[in-house]
């Protein structure tokens, strides 16, 4: 904790400061791209000219079928699956390249242009659907790549903008936007479809994205030293706190050292574990509610949105508490990271395993479902920002690699869960949550043993070797 003692004793503003304002701006970017990605999942119900027996049929949908504001398309379930998954391909392909280039090129330009592209493509989805399926797939794939740029490149921001004792708060504030976006989509998409037609969903979220993009180019700067509006005291506070970590010199990426680093593998394993449980809770919560509670579609949508809201709250709480423990010297950095990672892995496992045994009580199922889906966001104060501790110079690349590993875990989890539900419906939920708990515990054990918060040798400045 020697680095903490180097921080300037002069107290600077917190939530009224520019660094927190920029973190909130990134939060808005994340809300937008998540909303643009998730809205098609719901609008697909009223875009197709057939009713999926496992989907969302109801009387309001029948009314929408007769509304000229909602064009209908004869897309088979297979075509719908291709369209819905096309975004993921773009995100996966772009991860590692963005992680590399975000440490070289301007983060402001990368995120700004990517957000603009994603928003413009959102505006083009309705006309693309009228032209043909191929155009929708292309738009969604490119949009996924653009959203992947925003989601990955943003972590490079905190290398120069986040003081060590404020990393938890700043990163959790911004990344919690990924959780608030789906909550907003679940609340407003149905209303927009009923009143204005499904194309307006894409137009509204696309227009909001363009507006946020303009704010981004005006307000954000890659380095606090270059920002014309930041106060001198805040600028000195940030630069002084990061003087031991941030350097303007650019060294080649030590790929071999990164691949051999056990702390990096601990972070990647943690990401794999998090996305495994997160994807299960995200994709299968509506199905679980339908099978256990037998509610109508409107109630299902409302109940499905609650875990996102509480996850947003838990994520921000994790950031506040993690920095509180560090600021008061209650715990070391690695103790804080392991504590919140343990909470983010164990609590969803415990609440998830209890869910299949609560079939007779409505409120207990809802409460445990919310807790199982929300408490995983405690990882925002743990493994999610651990890469910034061990290798701030290469945080963007490490975050990209760990996110890619996590997305693979999420893909395996969603596919395997689908097979379990199909082959053994009676005990499927028990098997699903037991497997999720086993993955969470295994991933946590590995992380607790291997993880560290010390800057790795391969991530340190090597300027003396050039003299």
UniProtKB/Swiss-Prot annotation:
Glycan-modified residues: 41, 49, 58
Keywords: Cell membrane, Glycoprotein, Ion transport, Membrane, Sodium, Sodium transport, Symport, Transmembrane, Transmembrane helix, Transport
Covalent S-S links between cysteines: none
Tissues expressing this chain: Expressed in kidney cortex, liver and brain but not in other tissues.
Record-linked InterPro entries: MFS, MFS_dom, MFS_Na/Anion_cotransporter, MFS_trans_sf, Pi_cotranspt
Subcellular location: Apical cell membrane
Single GO biological process annotation from the record: urate metabolic process
Topology with respect to the bilayer: Multi-pass membrane protein
GO molecular function: sodium:phosphate symporter activity; transmembrane transporter activity
Translocase listed as a keyword: no
Protein's UniProt keywords contain Transmembrane helix: yes
Catalytic activity annotation: 3 Na(+)(out) + phosphate(out) = 3 Na(+)(in) + phosphate(in); urate(out) = urate(in)
Pfam families hit by this protein: MFS_1 (PF07690)
GO cellular component terms, semicolon-separated: apical plasma membrane; membrane; plasma membrane
TM regions (residue ranges): 81-101, 119-139, 178-198, 200-220, 257-277, 301-321, 339-359, 365-385, 401-421, 433-453
Subunit structure: Interacts with PDZK1.
Function: Important for the resorption of phosphate by the kidney. May be involved in actively transporting phosphate into cells via Na(+) cotransport in the renal brush border membrane. Plays a role in urate transport in the kidney.
Family: Belongs to the major facilitator superfamily. Sodium/anion cotransporter family.
Record protein name field: Sodium-dependent phosphate transport protein 1
């Amino acid at each position: 904790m020697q680095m903490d003692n180097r921080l300037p004793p002069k107290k600077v503003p917190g939530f009224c400061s520019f660094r927190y304002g920029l973190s909130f701006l990134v939060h808005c970017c994340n809300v937008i791209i998540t909303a643009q990605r998730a809205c098609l999942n719901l609008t697909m119900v009223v875009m197709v000219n057939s009713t999926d027996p496992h989907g969302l049929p109801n009387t309001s949908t029948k009314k929408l079928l007769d509304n000229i504001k909602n064009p209908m398309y004869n897309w088979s379930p297979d075509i719908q699956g291709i369209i819905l998954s096309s975004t993921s391909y773009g995100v996966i392909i772009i991860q590692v390249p963005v992680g590399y280039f975000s440490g070289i090129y301007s983060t402001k330009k990368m995120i700004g242009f990517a957000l603009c592209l994603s928003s413009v493509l959102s505006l083009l989805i309705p006309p693309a659907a009228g032209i043909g399926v191929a155009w929708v797939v292309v738009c969604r794939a490119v949009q996924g790549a653009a959203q992947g740029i925003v989601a990955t490149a943003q972590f490079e921001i905190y290398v120069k903008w986040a003081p060590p004792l404020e990393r938890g708060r700043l990163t959790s504030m911004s990344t919690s936007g990924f959780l608030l976006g789906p909550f907003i989509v679940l609340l407003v998409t149905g209303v927009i479809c009923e009143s204005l037609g499904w194309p307006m969903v894409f137009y509204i979220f696309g227009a909001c994205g363009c507006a946020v993009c303009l704010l981004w180019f005006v307000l954000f700067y890659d380095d606090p030293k270059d920002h014309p509006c930041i106060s001198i005291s805040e600028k000195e506070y940030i630069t002084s706190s990061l003087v031991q970590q941030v350097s303007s010199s650019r060294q080649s990426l030590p790929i071999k050292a990164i691949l051999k680093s056990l702390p990096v593998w601990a972070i990647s394993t943690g990401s794999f574990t998090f996305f495994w449980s997160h994807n299960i809770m995200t994709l299968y919560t509506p199905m679980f509610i339908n099978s256990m509670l037998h509610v109508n579609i409107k109630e299902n949508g409302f109940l499905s949105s609650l875990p996102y809201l509480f996850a947003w709250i838990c994520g921000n709480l994790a950031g506040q508490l993690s920095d509180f423990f560090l600021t008061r010297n209650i715990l070391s950095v690695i103790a804080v990271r392991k504590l919140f990672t343990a909470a983010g892995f164990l609590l969803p496992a415990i609440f998830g395993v209890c869910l299949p045994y609560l079939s007779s009580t409505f409120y207990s199922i809802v409460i445990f479902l919310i807790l199982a889906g929300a408490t995983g966001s405690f990882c925002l104060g743990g493994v999610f920002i651990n890469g910034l501790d061990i290798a701030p110079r290469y945080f963007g690349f490490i975050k990209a690699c760990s996110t890619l590993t996590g997305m693979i875990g999420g893909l395996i989890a969603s596919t395997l869960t689908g097979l379990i539900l199909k082959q053994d419906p009676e005990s499927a939920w028990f098997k699903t949550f037991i497997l999720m708990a086993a993955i969470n515990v295994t991933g946590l054990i590995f992380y607790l043993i291997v993880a560290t918060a010390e800057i790795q040798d391969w991530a340190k400045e090597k300027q003396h070797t050039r003299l």
